[in-house]
């Protein structure tokens, strides 16, 4: 499983998602992730909206194996359901 987290500096939900991904990387085989700072990379909400397929107003925006799954709360729920791991 490969997760990409699009976030920005100062975003507490981005930090939570990144921390959970780091925890999963250490505990789940074949799990890896990439954190993308949208400000540093010059990515706009419009760019993210195109990737997600609907308007994006918040970050983080999280993709699992290239499929958009939503934000931090969605990611936490999926990881708890799939692996029993919580942030």
From Swiss-Prot:
Question: Organism, per UniProt?
Answer: Haemophilus influenzae (strain ATCC 51907 / DSM 11121 / KW20 / Rd)
Q: Which GO terms describe its molecular function?
A: electron transfer activity; glutathione disulfide oxidoreductase activity; protein-disulfide reductase activity
SS bonds (residue pairs): 11-14
Q: Spell out the family assignment given in the record's similarity comment.
A: Belongs to the glutaredoxin family.
Report one GO cellular component: cytoplasm
Descriptive protein name: Glutaredoxin
Q: Which stretches make up the Glutaredoxin domain? A: 1-87
Q: Which PROSITE patterns match?
A: GLUTAREDOXIN_1, GLUTAREDOXIN_2
Q: Which GO terms describe its biological process?
A: cell redox homeostasis; cellular response to oxidative stress
Subcellular localization, per the record?
Cytoplasm
Question: Does the record bear Cytoplasm in its keywords?
Answer: yes
């Amino acid at each position: 499983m490969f997760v990409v987290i699009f976030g920005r500096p100062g975003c507490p939900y981005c930090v939570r998602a990144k921390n959970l991904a780091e925890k999963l990387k250490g505990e789940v085989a074949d799990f890896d992730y990439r954190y993308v700072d949208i400000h540093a990379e010059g990515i706009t909400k419009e760019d993210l909206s195109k990737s997600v397929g609907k308007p994006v107003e918040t970050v983080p925006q999280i993709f699992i194996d290239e499929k958009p799954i939503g934000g931090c709360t969605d990611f936490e729920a999926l990881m708890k359901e799939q692996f029993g791991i919580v942030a």
